[in-house]
Design a protein with these regions (language model features):
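Non-catalytic regulatory/interaction regions at protein termini and inter-domain linkers
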Residues: 1, 217-219
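Signal-transducing coiled-coil linker helices
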Residues: 2-41, 49-59, 65
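Conserved nucleotide-binding and Mg2+-coordinating catalytic segments in signaling enzymes
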Residues: 35-53, 71-84, 93
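Heptad-repeat coiled-coil signal-transmission/dimerization helices
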Residues: 51, 55, 91-92, 96-99, ...
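Active-site-proximal structural segments of metal-dependent nucleotidyl cyclase/transferase enzymes
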Residues: 54-83, 110, 150, 216
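GGDEF/GGEEF active-site signature
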Residues: 96-162
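A short glycine-enriched loop-to-beta-strand structural element that forms part of the catalytic core
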Residues: 148-179, 195
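Catalytic/regulatory signature loops of cyclic-dinucleotide turnover enzymes
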Residues: 171-217
Length: 219
């Protein structure tokens, strides 16, 4: 009697498990597709909206130990004109990968558009200077390309809530953007001061900056 019942129970359990397994697979695939939709396909960093959502969440939870960095590729048009668009894409992918590496698993990196990126990293205040210096070195390393390498130059601006007396993300981005512009083409990370946060802005960006006037007005 027992011998005949066990196979039937096993079959019944298997039959019940099949729809569950199918639903789990469907959910996993759906999650991957949704995640991919929020990622920039070239650099695999987060798109602007997804980056903003995650950065705001980090700021709400860890405002005492975060650093926001804005990065802008220098001489990018010249690189494209000289080496071709494939080389430009390779350089952008390298910037995204290096920012993601620098931000680490507890941080977030995103592509804001074109050759502009942002990263928010959790770093204890006593380690922030060293980590920013490391980022500057990281961004000057040549990018392997075909049988050689591409030169890479990136302008960097950094802002912390303590430095600008605000944990508001648009304020931090405005300050980091103004600091980055101040140190354009130097290869250094310029750290934002309180006055950088008061620079007139459009959509949280320094007024007059490329792309700042889209769907916004000066603040």
């Amino acid at each position: 009697m027992t011998t005949t019942l066990l196979p039937r129970k096993a079959l019944h359990i298997t039959a019940m498990a099949l729809p569950l397994a199918g639903w789990t697979l469907h959910t996993t695939v759906l999650h991957r597709r949704l995640t991919a939709a929020h990622r920039d396909p070239l650099t695999t960093t987060w798109r602007r909206e997804a980056f903003t959502t995650r950065a705001q969440r980090l700021l709400e939870r860890h405002s005492d130990e975060v650093v926001l960095v804005l990065a802008d590729a220098d001489h990018f048009k010249e690189l494209n004109d000289r080496h071709g668009h494939a080389a430009g894409d390779t350089a952008l992918a390298a910037i995204g990968a290096r920012l993601t590496e620098w931000a680490g698993p507890r941080g977030v990196a995103g592509r804001l558009g074109g050759d502009e990126f942002a990263a928010l990293a959790r770093i204890e205040p006593r380690h922030q200077t060293l980590r920013l210096e490391h980022l500057a070195r990281l961004m000057t390393r040549p990018v392997p390309y075909e049988d050689g390498s591409l030169p890479l130059a990136v302008s960097l601006g950094a802002a912390t809530p303590a430095a600008v007396a605000s944990s508001d993300l648009p304020t931090l981005m405005r300050a980091a953007d103004a600091a980055m512009y101040e140190g354009k083409y130097t290869g250094d990370v310029v750290r934002a001061r309180p006055d950088h946060a008061r620079v007139p802005s459009v959509n949280g960006r320094r007024a007059g900056r490329r792309g700042a006037a889209v769907r916004g007005r000066a603040a």
